A protein has these predicted regions:
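Glycine-rich ThDP/TPP pyrophosphate-binding loop and its adjacent helix/strand module
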Residues: 35-40, 45, 51-58, 68-84, ...
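Long amphipathic alpha-helical scaffold segments
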Residues: 6, 10, 17-50
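Amphipathic alpha-helical packing elements
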Residues: 52, 224-263
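Active-site metal-binding loops of divalent metal-dependent hydrolases
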Residues: 62-64
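Surface-exposed polar/charged interaction patches
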Residues: 15, 32, 240, 255, ...
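Short, small-residue-biased leader/transition segments that mark boundaries at the very start
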Residues: 2-3
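Intrinsic disorder at enzyme termini
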Residues: 252, 272-273
Length: 273
């Protein structure tokens, strides 16, 4: 009994290892339900046997919630240090309510409340979360690298603390040429053009004396301008406000270049000696 109790306590924060340890304990308890000494305790424990293994806790939400109207709550949760996982589907717009601009909407993108294109850059939610130093953070795009997404999800789940995984999510409001059937290809293009970057920040690496930041995408190899012009949320601005469109698109491209350069610097920081 002491051995099984030790195994349960040792795996209480590991959902992968917790299940086998719990199954072994349950099997042992079931063998001893008629034992004169521990039978009653075994029966009581088995009543709540479904509660023994560590549960995988995930919060799901969109960018309107995470970046904007629910940011205060999200920030409170990750700042608490509690072992909770958060997955954000970043469509860069309020998708469920009709396509209104949010703080996740990038420069130059047309949306409700930003009919002339958004003039200020997108909020950097990942950077805010990384600033705590004890939050696991990942930015992903399944169409660009599904292995990286899987790795991020597994790492987030195994991390004993708050985790934030932000995934690029093409949306019908983007007006993708070719439609939503090519959403995965659009994600790949977004990363190749430097429009979206994928990376991971794992605080456990810092504890090991390693750089906690890992950049998982190469330098942009495709045209940023060609990418955004493949979506109505951007190319429509060239028809309604052509001069403003040029100014905002140039600004957006510069923001993207500076963002990648900054991420490269983070990734190149030396490990602690």
């Amino acid at each position: 009994t002491t051995l099984f109790r030790s195994q349960i306590l040792d795996t209480v924060c590991d959902s992968t290892a917790s299940r086998p340890a719990t199954d072994a304990l349950i099997a042992e308890l079931e063998k001893n339900v008629d034992d004169a000494k521990v039978g009653e305790l075994a029966k009581k424990t088995l009543i709540d046997k479904d509660e023994l293994a560590k549960k995988s806790m995930w919060i799901f939400g969109g960018d309107g919630w995470a970046y904007d109207i629910g940011f205060g709550g999200l920030d409170h949760v990750i700042a608490s240090g509690e072992n909770v996982n958060i997955l954000v589907f970043d469509t860069e717009v309020y998708s469920n309510t009709g396509g209104q601009a949010s703080k996740a909407t990038p420069v130059g993108s047309v949306a409700q409340f930003a009919a002339a294109g958004k003039s200020v850059k997108k909020k950097d939610l990942a950077a805010i979360a990384m600033s705590y130093g004890y939050v696991y953070v990942a930015q992903c795009a399944m169409g660009a690298d599904n292995n990286q997404v899987l790795k991020a999800m597994v790492e987030a789940e195994s991390y004993n603390g708050p985790s934030l995984v932000i995934c690029y999510a093409p949306c019908i409001n983007h007006g993708i040429k070719g439609g939503m059937s090519i959403a995965q290809q659009e994600e790949k293009k977004a990363v190749e053009a430097g429009y979206w970057n994928i990376f991971r920040y794992d605080p456990r690496r810092a504890d090991e004396g390693k750089n906690p930041f890992m950049l998982d995408c190469k330098a942009p190899s495709a045209s940023y301008r060609d990418f955004i012009m493949g979506e109505v949320r951007y190319n429509s601005l060239t028809r309604s406000f052509p001069e403003r469109a040029e100014q905002l698109f140039a600004k957006a491209e510069k923001v993207a270049e500076e963002k990648y350069a900054h991420l490269e610097k983070l990734a190149s920081l030396p490990d602690a000696e």
